[in-house]
């Protein structure tokens, strides 16, 4: 029997990428159009919400048209419309939500609301089918979370950052090093050229929880650089980057594998913008091997680690099957989060 073809038009506009995708049956990308705003925000050293919103207004219709054309489909072929409604920048989110609602209304299509962070996790569906229970390490500019999924569509935060997210720490360190925004890719490159000579702190590494903290590392890094400036000492940029990244990766890997062992999960999904970091990818793979864990490590391709509409379509396919739909009064929720589970 031929599988029924479900085509979802998916919108992502939570931060500084406008993306529209057409996804078939939750696992095949027919189109994934992304309009990035990085150059517009680089001179500010970070994302300016008002600038981001204006760019989304300019790009959302163009991206929608291009996504449909690349996929070779029309509105009449669609099964549903999906959209990120949080977390993110409220003005940016509203552009995508408004566009999705307008199309759903005009073409009498179901509207599927998607948590942006769930989208990052479900990007792994483009690599292989997910098996539950699984553990996801979510690392981005705004989040550093360990998420336990006992089943499809069920998310429980078991570890979170107490202060800065990992990606946020990378960008702040990048400003100190004089690296253009976004700094993660360049710091990762420099780290592979240097050595861990500064031995920066590994916060909360030995504490009996799965939470993270990167503010102490950030402060130690900044103080080291400022002290060197005051005494006229020149520090090796590659060694600084390597020392910073070694601290971040060791903490992320240690806590993640500790959780995976406790929960006896089948798969470990690495998701979010920082999932593109080669140091983190290498560290997790090496950690799993050295610990002798029977754990399937799933990492989306680099092009799907950042914000994109395809991941929203993958998540929406699950939500649609579970009849998780929204009315036309759907609104943006900038602080949207998963439920918390404090004890393993």
Curated annotation (Swiss-Prot):
InterPro entries for the chain: ATPase_NBD, Gcp-like_dom, KAE1/TsaD, Peptidase_M22_CS, TsaD
GO molecular function annotations of the record: iron ion binding; N(6)-L-threonylcarbamoyladenine synthase activity
GO cellular component, one term: cytoplasm
Protein residues bound to substrate: 138-142, 171, 184, 188, 277
Pfam families: TsaD
Gene Ontology BP terms: tRNA threonylcarbamoyladenosine modification
Keywords: Acyltransferase, Cytoplasm, Iron, Metal-binding, Transferase, tRNA processing
Protein EC: 2.3.1.234
Subcellular location: Cytoplasm
Top enzyme class: transferase
Binding site for Fe cation: 116, 120, 307
PROSITE patterns per UniProt: GLYCOPROTEASE
Record note on cofactor: Binds 1 Fe(2+) ion per subunit.
Reactions catalysed according to its record: L-threonylcarbamoyladenylate + adenosine(37) in tRNA = N(6)-L-threonylcarbamoyladenosine(37) in tRNA + AMP + H(+)
Xref: CDD domains: ASKHA_NBD_TsaD_bac
Gene3D superfamilies attached to this UniProt entry: 3.30.420.40
Reported cofactor(s): Fe(2+)
Main location: cytoplasm
Record family assignment: Belongs to the KAE1 / TsaD family.
Role this protein plays: Required for the formation of a threonylcarbamoyl group on adenosine at position 37 (t(6)A37) in tRNAs that read codons beginning with adenine. Is involved in the transfer of the threonylcarbamoyl moiety of threonylcarbamoyl-AMP (TC-AMP) to the N6 group of A37, together with TsaE and TsaB. TsaD likely plays a direct catalytic role in this reaction.
Protein name: tRNA N6-adenosine threonylcarbamoyltransferase
């Amino acid at each position: 029997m031929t599988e029924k073809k479900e085509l979802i038009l998916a919108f992502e506009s939570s931060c500084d990428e406008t993306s529209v995708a057409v996804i078939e049956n939750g696992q095949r990308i027919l189109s994934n159009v992304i309009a990035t705003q990085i150059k517009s925000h680089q001179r500010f050293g970070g994302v300016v919400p008002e600038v981001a919103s204006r760019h989304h207004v300019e790009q959302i219709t163009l991206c929608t048209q291009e996504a449909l054309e690349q996929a070779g489909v029309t509105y009449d072929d669609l099964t549903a419309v999906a959209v990120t409604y949080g977390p993110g920048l409220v003005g940016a989110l509203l552009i995508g939500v408004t566009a999705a609602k307008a199309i759903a209304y005009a073409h009498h299509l179901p509207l599927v609301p998607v948590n942006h962070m769930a989208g990052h996790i479900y990007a792994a569906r483009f690599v292989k089918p997910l098996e539950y229970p699984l553990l996801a390490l979510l690392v981005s500019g705004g989040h550093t979370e360990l998420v336990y999924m006992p089943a499809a569509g069920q998310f429980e935060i078991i570890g979170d950052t107490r202060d800065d997210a990992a990606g946020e720490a990378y960008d702040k360190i990048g400003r100190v090093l004089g690296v253009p925004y976004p700094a993660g890719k360049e710091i990762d490159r420099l780290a592979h050229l240097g050595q861990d000579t500064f031995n920066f702190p590994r916060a909360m590494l030995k504490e009996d929880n799965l939470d993270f903290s990167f503010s102490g590392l950030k402060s130690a890094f900044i103080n080291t650089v400022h002290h060197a400036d005051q005494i006229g000492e020149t520090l090796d940029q590659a060694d600084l980057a390597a020392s910073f990244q070694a601290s971040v990766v060791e903490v992320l890997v240690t806590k993640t594998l500790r959780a995976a062992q406790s929960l006896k999960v089948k798969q470990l999904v690495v998701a979010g913008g920082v999932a593109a970091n080669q140091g983190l990818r290498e560290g997790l793979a090496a950690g799993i091997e050295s610990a002798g864990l029977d754990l399937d490590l799933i990492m989306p391709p680099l092009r799907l680690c950042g914000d994109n509409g395809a991941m929203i379509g993958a998540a929406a396919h699950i939500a649609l099957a579970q009849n998780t739909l929204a009315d036309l009064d759907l609104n943006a929720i900038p602080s949207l989060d998963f439920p918390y589970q404090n004890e393993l």
